[in-house]
Amino acid sequence: MPTFLHHALLACGFLTRLVPARVATADDMAAAVRWFPLAGLVVGGACWLPFALGLAASHPAIQAWLYVLINLWVTRGLHWDGVADLADAWGSSATGERFWDILKDSRIGAFGVMGLLLGFGGQYIGAHEIFISGRLGVLIAAPIVGRGACVILAALVPPGSRSTLGRLTCAGADRIAIGVAATCGILVLLLTTPVMTTVTTIAICGAIVTALAHLARREGGINGDFMGACIAGCEGAVLLAASMG
């Protein structure tokens, strides 16, 4: 199998359940980071196709709920675990080792629940408006932009001392990966939303990445939870910005 195809399949297998997971070395995982936008395309296509075929047509509220459900199933809820963990750690106002203890705790607390409710609510509202407007292409754009933003975040902050996934992702967030992520994100937004909406979306996603990078630097680095929160947050930003544009 060609090396590029192995890395592409590795990215899709890691970020979705639609491609079988593969055994990989640390170098392979780092090389797969360049293919994160492709994994976003796979997720977006899987979320878009049922509705393009008419699933729950004329019932946008039901479609929006199903969209959130399909997105969760396709990704195994991987990124939302990061949302909950990071919300608990940040909401506790803890710093240093205590911050990381909470972040790594598999149990969910009150702030984690609130973070999930806000995140799911934002996705649902944005998707509902998208279904009303009929601009289904945004459903494909959102996951691509989210995973591209994750690559940029990984390039901005080094991994934390207690990070495993973060270390592998940061190692692969080189100039080529950043260029691919930014180019794919901007192009797909321009293809699916008006120019001003694209500008607004980039600004919001930039603010999310900046805020997460600031928090990560304060706490000594990033891990997979930061990246998951970045993906989920930027996906929601695309949907909400497009619904208002």
Curated annotation (Swiss-Prot):
State a GO cellular component annotated for this protein. Answer: plasma membrane
Keywords assigned: Cell inner membrane, Cell membrane, Cobalamin biosynthesis, Magnesium, Membrane, Transferase, Transmembrane, Transmembrane helix
**What transmembrane ranges does the database entry give?**
35-55, 108-128, 137-157, 176-196, 197-217, 222-242
Q: How does it sit in the membrane?
A: Multi-pass membrane protein
What's an example GO BP annotation here?
cobalamin biosynthetic process
Q: In which pathway does it act?
A: Cofactor biosynthesis; adenosylcobalamin biosynthesis; adenosylcobalamin from cob(II)yrinate a,c-diamide: step 7/7
Q: What reaction(s) does this enzyme catalyze?
A: alpha-ribazole + adenosylcob(III)inamide-GDP = adenosylcob(III)alamin + GMP + H(+); alpha-ribazole 5'-phosphate + adenosylcob(III)inamide-GDP = adenosylcob(III)alamin 5'-phosphate + GMP + H(+)
* Family affiliation: Belongs to the CobS family.
- What PANTHER family is this protein classified in? ADENOSYLCOBINAMIDE-GDP RIBAZOLETRANSFERASE
This protein is called Adenosylcobinamide-GDP ribazoletransferase
* Natural source organism: Nitratidesulfovibrio vulgaris (strain DP4) (Desulfovibrio vulgaris)
